[in-house]
């Protein structure tokens, strides 16, 4: 197994490793939960019509994904390597459908907020200019990939202006992803 699967690859590995689970809670590594947060997330997941439970504001830094969502919309696109935009890509798959989402919970969590000695985010790439440059480049390339896949309107999530299928191909299922090794290699740049 490579040393860095990337965000999508890691999330897919979680899903594939626990195939019998009714849902998966996927969280950024630097999220801290307040007491009761995960219990509330579990309670919201009991509604069979709910497809995704977000921590707050519809964000993807901590989310619960139901098994029927993966059956209908597939796994995460591993071309979005090493990270960034994989959540937006997944959201674009069901933007034209009536998927029930819980956008915020009453219990909180911390991500990107200082609390005591907590420091958010990966400190490695922030302290290493060469790694930071590679992360920035990969982020920009991932955004361009999403422009091709969903149209330039993907960033604003405007329903009527985005493609209904990947790459605007009518016969393409929304769950379509293919692993393009050359595309990923071009972005690898030391990751």
Protein language model regions, located:
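Conserved donor nucleotide-binding strand/loop of the catalytic core
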Residues: 1-5
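Alpha-helical elements of Rossmann-like donor-binding domains used by nucleotide-donor carbohydrate transfer enzymes
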Residues: 9, 13, 36-43, 89-93, ...
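Active-site nucleotide-sugar/metal-binding loop of Leloir-type enzymes
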Residues: 12-23
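Short beta-strand-to-loop acidic/aromatic patch adjacent to the donor-nucleotide binding site
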Residues: 21-32
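Conserved donor NDP-sugar-binding/catalytic core segment of glycosyltransferases
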Residues: 31-62, 68
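Conserved nucleotide-sugar donor-binding catalytic segment
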Residues: 59, 64-65, 75-80
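Acidic donor-binding loop at a coil-to-helix junction in glycosyltransferase catalytic cores
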Residues: 83-89
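C-terminal catalytic/acceptor-binding lobe
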Residues: 91-191
């Amino acid at each position: 197994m490579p040393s860095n699967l990337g965000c999508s690859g890691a999330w897919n590995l979680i899903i594939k490793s626990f195939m019998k689970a009714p849902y998966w809670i996927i969280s950024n590594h630097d999220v801290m939960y307040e007491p009761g947060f995960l219990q509330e997330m579990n309670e919201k997941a009991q509604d069979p019509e709910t497809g995704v439970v977000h921590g707050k504001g519809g964000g993807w830094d901590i989310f619960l994904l139901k098994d029927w969502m993966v059956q209908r919309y597939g796994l995460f696109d591993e071309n979005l390597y090493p990270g960034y935009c994989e959540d937006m890509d997944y959201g674009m798959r069901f933007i034209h459908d009536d998927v029930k989402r819980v956008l915020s919970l009453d219990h909180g969590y911390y991500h990107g907020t200082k609390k005591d000695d907590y420091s958010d985010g990966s400190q490695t790439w922030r302290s290493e200019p060469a790694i930071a440059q590679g992360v920035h480049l990969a982020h920009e390339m991932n955004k361009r990939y999403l422009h091709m896949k969903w149209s330039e309107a993907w960033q604003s999530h405007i329903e009527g202006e985005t493609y209904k299928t990947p790459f605007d191909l009518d016969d393409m299922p929304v769950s379509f992803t293919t692993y393009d090794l050359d595309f990923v290699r071009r972005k690898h740049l030391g990751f």
